[in-house]
Amino acid sequence: MAAVVALSLRRRLPATTLGGACLQASRGAQTAAATAPRIKKFAIYRWDPDKAGDKPHMQTYEVDLNKCGPMVLDALIKIKNEVDSTLTFRRSCREGICGSCAMNINGGNTLACTRRIDTNLNKVSKIYPLPHMYVIKDLVPDLSNFYAQYKSIEPYLKKKDESQEGKQQYLQSIEEREKLDGLYECILCACCSTSCPSYWWNGDKYLGPAVLMQAYRWMIDSRDDFTEERLAKLQDPFSLYRCHTIMNCTRTCPKGLNPGKAIAEIKKMMATYKEKKASV
């Protein structure tokens, strides 16, 4: 009996050894595959106004995706830290909250911190600053006009009787507060405004979707007393009425908001306001 057991063990040993060798080879192949470089190319808009004779051009960088985070901003930071420290762009929160890293990625305006890298290694990812804006350097647009327009709508609570300011709360019902959902979440990244053809051609007069959505946010706030005055400021032919419902703004918003709908609501409010004004 002992001889039979010994024979059985001897017969199994080669199979066991062979299985172990196969498993080890398989693990080795997986490790090799995991460590194989995954080189992704990024073509990035470059322009330095402080460099004499420099003209806007595209510069291509290569990044190993195995050594990079999943978002486009991760790749930009890696390029700046490890390849080219002169590359300039804005960024802050890295969580889709501040709006700093807004740029045009593969043809669409979005946030670099929330846009995942296209892992197709055969395609070059193209990155530009927000379109139709003056460029300060590389991927940094000049947002001075955008912020000035935002300031012009007085984006804060206004009361006609200020005697109670700081002495009591301005209460809202749940229903009144819910009217602000889909409006207050705007982070002023300018993705929507810079995707709007009407804003491209009339940016000096047309306020654009981002600013108009914020104007609407304060018009319908139950605590605000200046709705009619806010409407009166938009009566000219350009501030509001250059919107032609192209809806690029809604399609591109990285927060999933609907500026086009807000503008349509302002137009309806404006019609009622004008009727009321004419009847006086």
From Swiss-Prot:
Pfam families: Fer2_3, Fer4_17. Binds 1 [2Fe-2S] cluster. Binds 1 [3Fe-4S] cluster. One of its GO terms (biological process) is mitochondrial electron transport, succinate to ubiquinone. One of its GO terms (molecular function) is 4 iron, 4 sulfur cluster binding. The modification N6-acetyllysine is found at K51, K55. Its EC number is 1.3.5.1, 1.1.5.-. Enol-oxaloacetate inhibits the succinate dehydrogenase activity. Changing D48V: In MC2DN4; decreased succinate dehydrogenase (ubiquinone) activity in homozygous patient cells; decreased protein levels in homozygous patient cells. A ubiquinone binds at W201. Changing S163P: Found in a patient with a Cowden-like phenotype; uncertain significance; patient cells have increased manganese superoxide dismutase expression and increased levels of reactive oxygen species; 2.7-fold increase in AKT expression and a 1.7-fold increase in MAPK expression. [4Fe-4S] cluster binds at C186, C189, C192, C253. Pathway: Carbohydrate metabolism; tricarboxylic acid cycle; fumarate from succinate (eukaryal route): step 1/1. Residues 146-218 are annotated as: Interaction with SDHAF1. The keyword Acetylation applies. It comes from the Eukaryota. Its main location: mitochondrion. It is a peripheral membrane protein. Gene3D superfamilies: 3.10.20.30, Alpha-helical ferredoxin. Residues 176-206 form the 4Fe-4S ferredoxin-type domain. Iron-sulfur protein (IP) subunit of the succinate dehydrogenase complex (mitochondrial respiratory chain complex II), responsible for transferring electrons from succinate to ubiquinone (coenzyme Q). SDH also oxidizes malate to the non-canonical enol form of oxaloacetate, enol-oxaloacetate. Enol-oxaloacetate, which is a potent inhibitor of the succinate dehydrogenase activity, is further isomerized into keto-oxaloacetate. Belongs to the succinate dehydrogenase/fumarate reductase iron-sulfur protein family. Component of complex II composed of four subunits: the flavoprotein (FP) SDHA, iron-sulfur protein (IP) SDHB, and a cytochrome b560 composed of SDHC and SDHD. Interacts with SDHAF1; the interaction is required for iron-sulfur cluster incorporation into SDHB. This is Succinate dehydrogenase [ubiquinone] iron-sulfur subunit, mitochondrial. It comes from Homo sapiens (Human). The lineage of its organism: Eukaryota, Metazoa, Chordata, Craniata, Vertebrata.
